[in-house]
C-alpha cells in the first residue's frame, strides 16, 4: 500500500527488461564478447564470497521463507546475473526485531569502539574496491572506472563517520536558577529503515548506514530490486569488519511488503529514503501514524547556468560532468542547461563536440564513458521526452535516438531551442539528454531556474565573483556548484529544498539526522 505503486512499476519494468532483452539478444558479436567478460567477472565474484544472493537477518544469510527469488540482470546484455532471495513482510519483521534487539548493546558501546568497527569496514571496502566496482558495473551498468570511483566515494562516508562518531557533543546551558544545572545530551534515535535506489548501489547505502551506525543506531536496509548485489557484498564486508549480528540487516524482494513493514512498525524510529518525489510523499504519509523521523533525498531539476562571461572551456567541462555522469541517471544531473544569448551558439557548438566524443558501450569495455540505461522503461521515458521536445520546436544537434548497440543504450544527446512548455524542462529526464535553453538577463536565469517544484542541485558558470554571489544566494537549491560540475563530497551537507527532500546527508550535519536531543535539568544542586 505504501510504496506499492512505484515498487510495482520498478518490478514490472524489470520483467519488461527480461522480455525485451530476450528479443534483443540478436546483437553484435561485440555484445556477445561483452557477455563473456561479464560472465567471467560474475564467476570471480562468486568465488571471492562477495556475490551474495541471500538476505542478511540477525547476522545470518537466509533465503526467503517461501524460497521465492527474483532475477538480477545485467542492463548492458540482458543476462541474468543471479537469482536473489525475494523477501517480504515476515523476513522484514524479523530483521526489524533483530535490529531492535541489537540496538541496546550497539548503542552502549563507546564511540571509540564503534569507530574502530567502522574503520575496519572502510579498510575492507577499499581493499575490495576492484571487485565491488565490477559488481556495480555488472548489475547497474556504469563504466568500470566510474564504478570503482563510486566505491571510493561510498567508502569515504564510512571513513568520515568512523571519525565523526567520536565528535557527538552535547551541551551545558547556563542555568536560569542558581540551584539548577542544565544539560543537553545527543542519543541515537533507534532502529533505522534505509530505502536506497539503484543508481548508486553502494554510495547511497554507506551515506545512510555510516552515520546511523556511528551514532549508535541499528539499520534495516532495503536496496533496490534492480541492484541488490552490491548491498549484499557491502554487508558481507561489514560482518567481516565486526559489525555485530542485527546491527545491520539487508532485506530485498517484495518492495511493497518490505516498505509497509518498515513504515508501520513502531520499533522503527526513523526512515531514510533516496528516490522519486512521488514515492517520498507516500513515505511521509505512511510514517505519520507512528510519527517517525524522516529523511528524504528526492528528485531534482538541476539548472546549469552559463553566463556570457563564463570561461567556455570550464563551462563545457563542468556541464558535461554534471550532465553525463552515470549516463545522466543521477538526481543532481544538469537537467536544464541555461545559456545566455551572447555565448549560446558558441557553447552549443563546443558542448556538442565534447558530447560527440563520449564513448557508449558496455561498462567493462576499455574507454567506455557512457553505459546503458537501467532498463527499457528508462529508455522509453527518454524517448518520450525527446519526441515531445521535437514536436514543439526543439532541434536535435546530436543523438536523439537509441544507440546502434541496442539493448538499453541511448545516444548522448544535445537539443537546442528548448522552451518551458516542454516536458524535459519541467521533469527529471534521468538519461543522457542535455536540453539547451536560451536566456537574456541574470534575472531571467534566476526566474527560469527557480520555476520548478524541485530544489536539489544547481550549477553556475561565470568569471564574476559578484555575479556568482548574487545568483547562488537567489537560487532555491540545497547545493550550488560555481564553475564546477561535480560537487558532492562526504565532508559537505547534501540535500534539497522545496520538494527535493528533507534533511541532509554527509558532513557533521548528516549525523544529526540519526540523533535525538535530550534536555536534562538537575535540581536542588545547592544542597550540601
Swiss-Prot record:
Biological classification of the source: Eukaryota, Viridiplantae, Streptophyta, Embryophyta, Tracheophyta
Binding residues for substrate: 207, 325, 488
Enzyme class: oxidoreductase
Gene giving rise to this polypeptide: ALDH5F1
pH dependence: Optimum pH is 9-9.5.
Transit peptide limits: 1-34
Activity control, per UniProt: Competitive inhibition by NADH. Inhibited by ATP, ADP and AMP. Redox-regulated. Inhibited under oxydizing conditions.
Species of the source: Arabidopsis thaliana
Functional summary from the UniProt entry: Oxidizes specifically succinate semialdehyde. Involved in plant response to environmental stress by preventing the accumulation of reactive oxygen species, probably by regulating proline, gamma-hydroxybutyrate (GHB) and gamma-aminobutyrate (GABA) levels. Required for the maintenance of the shoot apical meristem (SAM) structure and subsequent adaxial-abaxial axis-dependent development of cotyledons and leaves.
Keywords (A to Z) from UniProt: Disulfide bond, Mitochondrion, NAD, Oxidoreductase, Transit peptide
Effect of inactivating the gene: Plants are sensitive to UVB and heat stress, and accumulate elevated levels of H(2)O(2). High light-dependent increased of proline, gamma-hydroxybutyrate (GHB) and gamma-aminobutyrate (GABA) levels. Treatment with gamma-vinyl-gamma-aminobutyrate, a specific gamma-aminobutyrate (GABA)-transaminase inhibitor, prevents the accumulation of reactive oxygen intermediates (ROI) and GHB in ssadh mutants, inhibits cell death, and improves growth. The ssadh mutant defects associated with stress responses are suppressed by POP2 disruption.
Protein name: Succinate-semialdehyde dehydrogenase, mitochondrial
